[in-house]
């Protein structure tokens, strides 16, 4: 029994090492590591600032960007970035400028974006491989440009959050006190939403919109 187990262990290890020699597997592992670090770095602030539904809404609304990319015969990833960025900023602006709660604004905008995304998806003729791949995700389909984008977003997050960590923590726990102390609350909020939107966009190809 021990001999059989050892043989299976050696065989499994050799197969794993053989898999790691393929470039697509190396990119998948590198992408998973980068996204894990990025998610952990931003996730604490997302949870404490109650932005979980916001990031969820950005991911689902990205269906519009994906459908537009397929219709225009462009790389869906490059359409995702500007769309999720604009969507996040517009939602935050509406939350600041209206008396509605953030959940109400997110629900309305998300429903509208999903409706537009479904309409655009129905206009796509023929093969929908790009659309399906982004909807459900495929970490093995990550290419070098995706790794570069994820790395850039991670570097940008580190550059923004680490030097201002004390201010970010105070802003997270007590926004009023942060504003009294002269911290640019509005600027920091919008900058964080930009990073969060970009993080969602670069992760969609691996984990999917749905």
Predicted regions and their residues:
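Membrane-helix/interface signature in polytopic inner-membrane proteins
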Residues: 159-192
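Structural signature of hydrophobic alpha-helical transmembrane segments
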Residues: 25-36, 74-86, 151-155, 202-210
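Membrane-interfacial amphipathic/re-entrant helices at transmembrane-helix boundaries
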Residues: 1-35, 188
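Transmembrane alpha-helices
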Residues: 187, 191-209
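Short amphipathic alpha-helical coupling elements at transmembrane boundaries
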Residues: 92, 96, 133-141, 176-180
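Transmembrane helix-bundle core of multi-pass membrane transporters
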Residues: 12-27, 106-167, 194
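Short loop segments and helix-boundary regions at transmembrane helix junctions
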Residues: 44-127
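Hydrophobic core segments of alpha-helical transmembrane domains in multi-pass membrane transport
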Residues: 32, 36-40, 66, 88-89, ...
């Amino acid at each position: 029994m021990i001999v059989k187990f050892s043989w299976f262990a050696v065989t499994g290890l050799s197969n794993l090492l053989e898999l790691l020699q393929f470039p697509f597997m190396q990119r998948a592992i590198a992408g998973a590591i980068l996204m894990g670090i990025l998610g952990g770095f931003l996730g604490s602030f997302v949870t404490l600032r109650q932005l979980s539904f916001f990031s969820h809404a950005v991911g689902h609304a990205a269906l519009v960007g994906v459908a537009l990319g397929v219709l225009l015969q462009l790389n869906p990833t490059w359409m995702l970035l500007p769309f999720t960025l604009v969507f996040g900023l517009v939602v935050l602006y509406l939350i600041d400028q209206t008396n509605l709660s953030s959940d109400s604004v997110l629900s309305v905008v998300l429903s509208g974006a999903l409706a537009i995304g479904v309409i655009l998806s129905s206009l796509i003729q023929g093969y929908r491989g790009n659309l399906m791949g982004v909807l459900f995700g495929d970490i093995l389909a990550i290419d070098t440009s995706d790794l570069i984008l994820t790395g850039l977003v991670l570097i940008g997050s580190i550059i923004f959050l680490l030097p201002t960590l004390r201010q970010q923590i105070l802003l997270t726990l007590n926004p009023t006190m942060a504003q009294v102390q002269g911290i640019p609350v509005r600027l920091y909020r919008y900058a964080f939403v930009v990073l969060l939107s970009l993080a969602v966009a670069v992760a969609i190809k691996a984990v999917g919109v749905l």
